[in-house]
Amino acid sequence: MAQQYQPGQRWISDSEAELGLGTILAQDGRLLTVLYPATGDTRQYSLRNAPLTRVRFSPGDQITHFEGWKLTVREVEDIDGLMVYHGLDGQNQPRTLPETQLSNFIQFRLASDRLFAGQIDPLSWFSLRYNTLQHTSKQMQSALWGLGGCRAQPIAHQLHIAREVADRSAPRVLLADEVGLGKTIEAGLVIHRQLLSGRANRVLILVPENLQHQWLVEMRRRFNLQVALFDAERFIESDASNPFEDAQLALVALEWLVDDEKAQDALFAAGWDLMVVDEAHHLVWHEDQASTEYSLVEQLAQVIPGVLLLTATPEQLGQDSHFARLRLLDPNRFHDLAAFRAESEHYRPVAEAVQELLDEGRLSPKAHATIQGFLGAEGEALLAAVNDGDTQASARLIRELLDRHGTGRVLFRNTRAAIQGFPERQLHPYPLATPEQYRDLPAGEHAELYPEVAFQAQGEAADDERWWRFDPRVDWLIDTLKMLKRTKVLVICAHAETAMDLEDALRVRSGIPASVFHEGMSILERDRAAAYFADEEFGAQVLICSEIGSEGRNFQFAHHLVMFDLPAHPDLLEQRIGRLDRIGQKHTIQLHIPYLQDSPQERLFQWYHEGLNAFLNTCPTGNALQHQFGPRLLPLLEGGESKAWDALVADARGERERLEAELHTGRDRLLELNSGGAGEGQALVEDILEQDDQFALPIYMETLFDAFGIDSEDHSENALILKPSEKMLDASFPLGDDEGVTITYDRAQALSREDMQFLTWEHPMVQGGMDLVLSGSMGNTAVALIKNKALKPGTVLLELLFVSEVVAPRSLQLGRYLPPAALRCLLDANGNDLASRVAFETLNDQLESVPRASANKFVQAQRDVLAKRISGGEEKILPIHVERVAEAQRRLAAEADEELARLVALQAVNPSVRDSEIDALRKQREDGLAMLEKAALRLEAIRVLVAG
């Protein structure tokens, strides 16, 4: 029968519930006009199939007048098609409320309200809501939360440091890993995990200007963190009173900040939870004087609770330098340089004893005495067990020593010597004759090392006279690429102009498909170039990069590197090799170095190879040697006697060997063990790889995309293209691009194809989609037909989903103890709960959809019965909720008490444990227990099942 519409009646939109209560204005022929006063919107619907549900309240319901007072309904009267509600107001006085005077802002979000208002959702949405709750609960309890979503190969020492640091309240640490071990990834993991956990909300990243772009790329590509890059132009053009306050994550160049006092004032006023400083070894400090940069960072460190300093300076080459960094972290603890040196010497024999235990599996009398003197009477039983060959006791002893290590909690330093998994390197030098065209170039830096740039700078050359027509390195490159055939080859040169010219040369002279990559391209253009290079089937054989353009990129799927020229500094040389030489590289790195004979290029090659040994091994001493020998090196590169040159190379080699020996003998094995995680990181790696192999996420996301009207189609193996369809349900779905995106769930694919989104449980698209499901009301009601021969036709089952949760600041981490969990109840006609006997999936497979009109009619007919059974379901679930809360309180108290006891005991023997850290943990314990006391049980969803 057709609906009867009367002006003044209140109806609610089935598709736009957020509009609030609608009022019928007019019925004109086949059109129905409805006003939604809450938003001021007017809608016209076809009279035959208007997506509207009549608003009818029942005795017991509480309703609101547009002036704000509430009425508890006792009786409902229908007068000429309009409802009039009679009942008691807040003062228990009898009152009447016609439906025309109902509040316009009433929304039916509660499951029971929506069910009885006729807002019944598709079965698929009910399942989606249930699965979303289950996955949310599981992820909040996961030890991998914030660690597994990074677009990087999981590496043990990085994961250990990230977890150790990110799980502290306001961490203040120095990350001093050797070059190539991934300090930027470690910092990104810490930032990401702190943000997800709520321990930090606003992060300031200070970097040298030349590394701003690298950080921007790393944070966005690896962690999906939207970092705001600040410079003078952005700061001046901003309309905000304080431009920094609008950015959750700000990336700032230290050079600009030092010169701009206005920007400094704004930065201090903005308020930050965590500060990250890269290249911290460039902050100059001496006992009698500090640089402007150091002083600025020092002032910021005094007002920002969390501080992360990144430095590449080897400790033994700069103990004073490390002290300067540690001073920034904890000036009370590190106040005296002489005392710091003495303390470091105090730990050296202990570290040597630990090394002996690791190498020999037992302790010599001397090592035993050293450790006994260090631990005192407390360590005697442990040492006795170690001497008896107890391997577990050995592990406990090492952990005890690590805990007491002077800087073990604030300083992390991993070395290549201690970390396994790096590839070997092979060097292939190619001396080539210097062409005549380069011999008479005007003097200058370009002419010395980059003659092609100097040649081009002389003026526009005819096409047949361009430098790549006569430079023998180009002929060599073409021949080498042909010899390597389909093998991927990365070519790096110093300048963007050279990279673009080489692409022209390869196209014109050989037809070899090449992709180019330089700083003049946008990030999107670089992504496309990198993707073209990475494509195994149809991609380019060669990618030609400029020095700056390749910063922060990872091309470890290739293992042939051509250096078309050599950089002027060993750090840049290591950065070039580091594009391929990473943990996880499966092949030996092949380094191809063409150079022009009898030129500065030849001498620079000899300097790096014979003096610094920088091609075949990492060169931690390179920066110091370049600084020490620079005054002799530069004049001799341009020319000069071969005898003087040979002497310089020999001197540099001798000094390098001396420094390397000093580094080796001075290795702090205790520090390395602590930084590497002593096996804990490897367990995290295995857990992440196991999670990667599961299909739960792709299966869940497919249902999510279907629900929101996102079309997916195959792109290639392990990759999908997502596009919004015409039926897209919610324009706010975080697809990332209105035109569509390409995604992969495969980590290896994501590492080689940076143009693809790497979907994990932590990805903004996944998290945003789940938030849309749980924050909306869609899916919290359903009615279905159940096909089961064991059930008598007409039998009604009621499935209820309750959520047991605590609403609290994320920083308290209560989701670890009481994650929002869906507590399911399946009631039969006698009130028995069958949920433990009938799994959700089993039940789901037996259900069929019911037309909405029929479902609504059935619900209205059974309203009183259903309302009683809903109350009965809550009574059955409440004891489970109460026990969950009690268990959460017990776990929180036990964990916090154990950690507090450890820190208090540790503080007695290791002053690096700050009072503020212990106080913060005590407060977190108290606040957490208080918030758990307020945990609530909420009816999340209702499904009515009728046997047929």
Swiss-Prot record:
Question: Which InterPro entries does its entry note?
Answer: Helicase_ATP-bd, Helicase_C-like, Helicase_RapA, P-loop_NTPase, RapA_C, SNF2-like_sf, SNF2/RAD54-like_C, SNF2_N
Binding sites annotated in the UniProt record for ATP: D177, E178, V179, G180, L181, G182, K183, T184
Residues annotated as domain Helicase C-terminal: 473-627
Q: Name a GO molecular-function annotation.
A: hydrolase activity, acting on acid anhydrides
- E.C. no: 3.6.4.-
Q: Where in the numbering of this chain does the Helicase ATP-binding domain appear? A: 164-332
Question: Which intervals of this chain are the motif DEAH box?
Answer: 278-281
- Keywords attached to this entry: Activator, ATP-binding, DNA-binding, Helicase, Hydrolase, Nucleotide-binding, Transcription, Transcription regulation
Keyword Lipid biosynthesis, does the record have it? no
Q: Give a GO biological-process term.
A: regulation of DNA-templated transcription
- Share what the entry says about its subunit structure, partners included: Interacts with the RNAP. Has a higher affinity for the core RNAP than for the holoenzyme. Its ATPase activity is stimulated by binding to RNAP.
Q: Which family does it belong to?
A: Belongs to the SNF2/RAD54 helicase family. RapA subfamily.
As for what it does, the entry says: Transcription regulator that activates transcription by stimulating RNA polymerase (RNAP) recycling in case of stress conditions such as supercoiled DNA or high salt concentrations. Probably acts by releasing the RNAP, when it is trapped or immobilized on tightly supercoiled DNA. Does not activate transcription on linear DNA. Probably not involved in DNA repair.
Protein name per UniProt: RNA polymerase-associated protein RapA
- The organism named in the record is Pseudomonas putida (strain GB-1)
